[in-house]
From Swiss-Prot:
The gene is ureF. This is Urease accessory protein UreF. Keywords: Chaperone, Cytoplasm, Nickel insertion. Signal peptide: none annotated. It is found in: Cytoplasm. Belongs to the UreF family. HAMAP family: UreF. The lineage of its organism: Bacteria, Bacillati, Mycoplasmatota, Mycoplasmoidales, Mycoplasmoidaceae. UreD, UreF and UreG form a complex that acts as a GTP-hydrolysis-dependent molecular chaperone, activating the urease apoprotein by helping to assemble the nickel containing metallocenter of UreC. The UreE protein probably delivers the nickel. It holds the Pfam family UreF. One of its GO terms (molecular function) is nickel cation binding. Required for maturation of urease via the functional incorporation of the urease nickel metallocenter. Its main location: cytoplasm. One of its GO terms (cellular component) is cytoplasm.
Amino acid sequence: MMLNSDYLNLLDLMQITNANFPIGTFSHSFGIETYIRKDIVFDGDSLIRALLLYMNEQLLHGDLLAIYQIFKLLPKQKINAIWEIDQMINFQGLARETREGQRRIGQQMVKIYNELFDCELLVEYAQRIKDRKSYGNPAVAFALLAMHLKIDLKTALYTHLYSTVAALTQNCVRAIPLGQVKGQKIIHKLKHVYFDDIIDKVFSLDFKTDFCKNIPGLEIAQMEHEDTPVRLFMS
């Protein structure tokens, strides 16, 4: 039986992953706007293909694998290794806009989390960012808070995957444009058809060889976005 505190922790998780949580995700397409401009993404089906590319490459080998690794490191008190993940995931990003966008979102998450929760590691993370010892990353911040809230690993992975994809889908729906109901149908399909496979893949990856491993296509689109004179999104 779940305790009252467990329900409150679950509500906290729902709050921080809500689309209205003010961390700035509404400003980013992470390269998909380039595909929209080139008419590679123009309807619901083509958007799903682009989102699957993002989910199976950058999100899987970056954020989700980082969360998985932090859940392994923190119980062993390997704190310095967690800060190394922040460094690694920042250095591996080739596209400047995407790298800076992730950094801004991560820093905002750390700032707001510290205003809402009493978590020593997040306080330390904020100080490291202030001292320029860390950059700030959404996956690192989320993993630290999820463990503070006693959220299990799989729930944390599914939740981060959902919140990231839902926010990105809503942004792309505005850009194409598609109707809001169509956007919800896309999110629903992604959840029920593809999420299980992606989460299963996380557990089969090796951190040393697979972390931040990407195919070049999406990163090229993200770098091309930097030279786009008229755009809706910062990345």
